[in-house]
Swiss-Prot record:
A GO molecular-function annotation: large ribosomal subunit rRNA binding
Subunit structure: Part of the 50S ribosomal subunit. Forms a cluster with proteins L3 and L19. In the 70S ribosome, L14 and L19 interact and together make contacts with the 16S rRNA in bridges B5 and B8.
Keywords: Ribonucleoprotein, Ribosomal protein, RNA-binding, rRNA-binding
InterPro entries with a match to the protein in the record: Ribosomal_uL14, Ribosomal_uL14_bac-type, Ribosomal_uL14_CS, Ribosomal_uL14_sf
Organism in which the protein naturally occurs: Geobacillus sp. (strain WCH70)
Protein name (database record): Large ribosomal subunit protein uL14
Function: Binds to 23S rRNA. Forms part of two intersubunit bridges in the 70S ribosome.
One GO location term (cellular component): cytosolic large ribosomal subunit
Biological process per Gene Ontology, one example term: translation
Lineage, top ranks: Bacteria, Bacillati, Bacillota, Bacilli, Bacillales
Gene3D superfamilies named among the record's database cross-references: Ribosomal protein L14 (2.40.150.20)
């Protein structure tokens, strides 16, 4: 479960490698984020020369979770790590490439640009 103080790997080439969740968006008392939810995070680790710098506050969408998600047909999908993609305010990704698989649930939440850039949609 992704909550405040959770650390996520960044699955794009925006320059950030790891972020720490500051807030889960979507309601005043919202505690947990799942796949497709937007969080506010700060960059804890970044690569030199990237678009995003260490210490910067960014918005990100969760694309993979260890907890997984239940689908309407009764199946579950879960991943080996918790990962996110850094986004702009218009839901478009800051980077130009996405690394690793992403869940199909992002399509329902209207993150079509991330779906199209991802190498695999599960």
């Amino acid at each position: 479960m992704i909550q405040q103080e959770s650390r996520l790997k960044v699955a794009d080439n925006s320059g950030a490698r790891e972020v720490l969740v500051i807030k889960v968006l979507g309601g005043s008392g919202r505690r947990y984020a799942n796949i497709g939810d937007v969080v506010v995070a700060t960059v804890k680790e970044a690569t030199p020369g990237g678009v995003v710098k260490k210490g910067q506050v960014v918005k990100a969408v969760v694309v993979r979770t260890k907890r997984g998600v239940r689908r309407s047909d009764g199946s579950y999908i879960r991943f080996d790590e918790n990962a996110c993609v850094i986004i702009r305010d218009d839901k478009s990704p800051r980077g130009t490439r996405i690394f690793g698989p992403v869940a199909r649930e992002l399509r329902d939440k209207d993150f079509m640009k991330i779906i199209s850039l991802a190498p695999e949609v599960i």
